[in-house]
């Protein structure tokens, strides 16, 4: 149809290039449909909603894409938005991070995404002599919870993510945790194999990184666990060790993680209540917006320590080291 000639004007449609581009986009998505999942961005999470929070500078609005990429890798981020055209601006920023980074070299904004295909080359965030790269995140920068965005990442390496923020019941939350633990149990066994796979190819992980496998610095070891008020960005092997390191069955490990995350949620809500913050601050029929809980989150991250430190509080995160991650 894009090549049909109008019988009146004798010309092709003026939108021919756009139509062909959209067809090409659709074909690429279909080609990768089985291996690249769709992430629905939560537009209820934004710094724009948290202007009343005096400590908002220490909160993080990132949403994980479940993709880790090395510096220099080409990645395509496809953004869909109902009612928008290809090339339209969005309220989505893409961030690249350095896995196990120093406090001052954690992240770099890559671009503000547009509707449709966004092809990017992952930048180097750090100059450390380890694998350069890390997890990719999106931050919603708008203030309209009715906006809808769906994102698909083509390229990089996918890793397991647990996000329980949209679970409406305890049963649904438990099911998500069970599925995550099952995926994690399989994933942790093959991280080194993934690093070394197709090592003779210039496009392989080991070739691009130029380094041998290092358990503590391989970006494939990432995972994110997203709660209402907290996001853990820590090594997946340490998560697994903490719940299954004593011979626990998969069901026991899942229950252990479920209870641990519930305890963290309850503790943070207690802290926020102590500060006078509440999910629905209503008194005498009046809603007090300044007393609402923040939408953005605390972020505990696997980071490189400076001399004498076992943890630190940075601008967008709380940094802890390898051994501490297994204690969470």
Regions found by a protein language model. Name each.
Residues 24, 141-220:
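Exposed low-complexity, polar/acidic, P/S/T/G-rich flexible segments that act as propeptides
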Residues 3-175:
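Beta-strand-enriched, solvent-exposed domains that form extended recognition/catalytic surfaces
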